Amino acid sequence: MILECKNLVIGYENRVVLKGINFEINDGEYVCLFGDNGSGKSTLVKTILGLNSKLKGEINFAKDVSQRSIGYLPQHNDNLTDFPASVYEVVRSGCLNRIGFRPFYNKNEVKRTRNMLKVLEIENLENRSFSELSGGQQQRVLLARALCATDKVLILDEPFTGLDGSTAKKLYEVLDKINKKLGVTLIIVSHFVEDLLKHANKVIHLSQECLFCGNPDEYKKHLKKEYLLSRHQLFEVGDEND
């Protein structure tokens, strides 16, 4: 177990957004955290990261994982596109939690920055201004930055929003590499589930509560069952109206 939610209730100022949240994420898993807009996905992520306070329940981490050691790539923000720093500076800033009260980055953090530039295949961009890059390039830079913060868990909030098909495909390839070769646990928040099911090995479906937690094959069976049930209920209503 790397992350666990038990009987979790979350929301804002006692207004419940999600309740009865129970799931466990294991080391090395590739998780699709799925739900419609407004289903509470981003609220759950912010609560896991400690940016929001939980109302009830527990969030437990493995001994070698903490909220500060989780890499996080938030939803696309237009304000970031004009960020004046270089690509190298943006990626290196992911090491800020590692330096503590030291005034400078050490050799290990510089080495880690270089390594993440290499992993994301953006070494040729390191001296470019972040604001000059395309959307897909900026996404890679921010992903490298998030990886500088973690060896264990990376959370990405709607990373495919605004990307064209070709760019999204390349991002999937990068994420597969991060998960399989680096062994990083991925939690991908999205409402685009179809393509993500081809890559993830666990699905968590939210809608005011945790509707499902299991592998993609089980989830497809769950969807089929829910569809047949809804069709059956629809026909029953139709019969009553006849």
Show where each model-derived region lies:
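Conserved ABC ATPase "signature" region
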Residues: 107-125
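Conserved ABC ATPase signature
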Residues: 129-133, 137
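Catalytic Walker B motif of ABC-type/P-loop ATPase nucleotide-binding domains
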Residues: 154-157
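Helix N-cap at the start of a conserved alpha-helix in ABC-type nucleotide-binding domains
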Residues: 165-167
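H-loop/switch region of ABC-family ATPase nucleotide-binding domains
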Residues: 190-191
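H-loop (His-switch) and adjacent beta-strand-loop-beta switch element
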Residues: 202-215
